[in-house]
Amino acid sequence: MKTLLLTLVVVAIVCLDLGYTLTCLICPEKDCQKVHTCRNEEKICVKRFYDKNQLGWRAQRGCAVSCPKAKPNETVQCCSTDKCNK
């Protein structure tokens, strides 16, 4: 009986998704507080700065599977801890 119970506990632990889910900020404002839970495959928080037609720099934040390459007139910052893309 103890063996059966132990087996059931092990199976339950293996079947549960015990993985860590990253959270990143997702708003463009400088003092962004809007948090988004990333999908399981998204392990990177991204913050992109880009020049918006002489209106100054804008930021775009979110989750990503990998760190994207910067486009012309753009700066990309990537990190991998919760809400690190401030």
UniProtKB/Swiss-Prot annotation:
It is found in: Secreted. Transmembrane segments: none annotated. It holds the Pfam family Toxin_cobra-type. Gene3D superfamilies: CD59 (2.10.60.10). Disulfide bonds join 24-45, 27-32, 38-63, 67-78, 79-84. InterPro entries: Snake_3FTx (IPR003571), Snake_toxin-like_sf (IPR045860), Snake_toxin_con_site (IPR018354), Toxin_cobra-type (IPR054131). Its main location: secreted. Residues 1-23 form the signal peptide. Binds with low affinity to muscular (alpha-1-beta-1-delta-epsilon/CHRNA1-CHRNB1-CHRND-CHRNE) and very low affinity to neuronal (alpha-7/CHRNA7) nicotinic acetylcholine receptor (nAChR). This is Weak toxin 1.
